[in-house]
Amino acid sequence: MTNTLHRQGNREDLKHDFVIFVHTAKGKNREGAAPKIREFMRICLKYHPVNMGDVKRGSIHQDDVEIDRLIAGQEDNTVAGAVFTDMETLQKVVEELIRADLGICINITGLLDEVKECCRKAGITRHSAEHSLGVWGAKDRLPEREVLEFNTMCGHGMVSFNLIRKMIEQVRLRRMTPKQAALMMAKCCECGAFNTTRAEALLTRMRERGFLDSSRTKHD
């Protein structure tokens, strides 16, 4: 299971949101995996991801994270990932990973048909696919859909609802640009799964078409 499965938004937005990450299995391929994880990150870095990191050491958008040290510090049990915004670039990453033949599990979060097509064009068939079953329970306690679109871009939900609302308000008041607000939110995401380009686009659209209205009906 991957917590990046729960990303929310419309299809057009999600067509520009792909997370690729590496995972090892204890007792299977974890021992001695650190050099392979480092190579995975080097390959991803070549294609200019909009975010990259791992949950233990943070992401490239955090002030004290330096990319070379981040890669050098990878360990056998690290879960590292990168975010891309188009299928063409993702395909190039997948093709290079195939050539590298690292022998560890590679996962991609994205629209199922888009990921399937990416794998087909790269010359492979995906091993399996997983779905999010959605949100269960007291859904009336969830924030507005617009807020959830930002919050679920962090696999651990560390971009708080209140911070998101504050960033929206700062953009509305023109105290911050959409890009500045998106980068501020990304600092809270330790795993590096937050898509800053998508967040900037969402904020720009909200500025052009109308901002969050707290009186709207919340998540259905």
Annotate each PLM feature.
Residues M1-Q170, P178-T197, R209-L212:
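Conserved mixed alpha/beta catalytic, RNA-binding, or beta-rich assembly cores of soluble enzyme
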Residues A201-D220:
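C-terminal domain-closing interface element
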